[in-house]
């Protein structure tokens, strides 16, 4: 897979862009995030689908808004029947394309997390 790029998708929890020096925050130094931003792809016009973390993460994971994927609060993880319901996550799509995928850290979108 040497001809494919590595993909690292960071899901920060409650991190505002005005608290990052790469976006102009002068009161804080964030060199590691700045390096990732400089060498990767930044989405300057990206907006969260939900102000609540679990629905927002599920929306990113599924490509569907909270109403369509069925996760509208922090009390539910991803639907246990999501595959039977025809929902495919982008990590699954990457895995199907031959990528090794992994989820590390606090996610709260799987019921066993």
Q: What spans do the regions from the language model cover?
A:
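Formylglycine-dependent sulfatase
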Residues: 1-113
